[in-house]
Amino acid sequence: MCLAYQSGSKTNTKPYTNSRPSFRKGVVEQVWENAKGPDGLVRDPNTGEVINWTPGESRKGVWDMGHIPEAKYSKRHEAYMNGKLTTKEFVDWYNDPANYRPELPSNNRSHKYE
C-alpha cells in the first residue's frame, strides 16, 4: 500500500506511510510464548493482570502486541519516513518478536504506562 505523506514541503509515497505492516507468520505466537512466566501464564506487564488467550484464536479485544519501551513504534516509523531505514529494515524490525510484549488493549492504547 502506497499513500502520500506530507512531511514539511515534500510528499512521500512510501509503503506504510499511513498503515502498519502485517505480522509475518509465527510472530504473534512467538511473542506470546516469550511472555509466559514460570507458571505458564501471560500477564500484562503494566498491571500484572493475567491475559487468557489460546494461540490460533483471534486476539482482537483480548491482547495487543505492545512495544517494549526501547522499541517505540513512532520513533522507528519516523526514522523510516526520514530515510534512515529502508523499507526492508523497517519491516524486519516490525516483525522482530523481541520488540513486543502482550498487553491488555486498554493499557496499550491509552499509553498510560509509557
Residue spans of the language-model regions?
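Low-complexity, glycine/serine/proline-rich disordered segments
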Residues: 1-43, 48-58, 114
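Structural recognition of the beta-strand scaffold that forms the well-ordered cores
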Residues: 43, 64, 101-103
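Short Cys/His-centered divalent metal-binding micro-motifs
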Residues: 91-114
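Short Cys/His-rich local motifs and their 1-3 flanking residues in nucleic-acid-associated proteins
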Residues: 49, 70, 106-109
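Histidine-centered nuclease catalytic patch
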Residues: 51-98
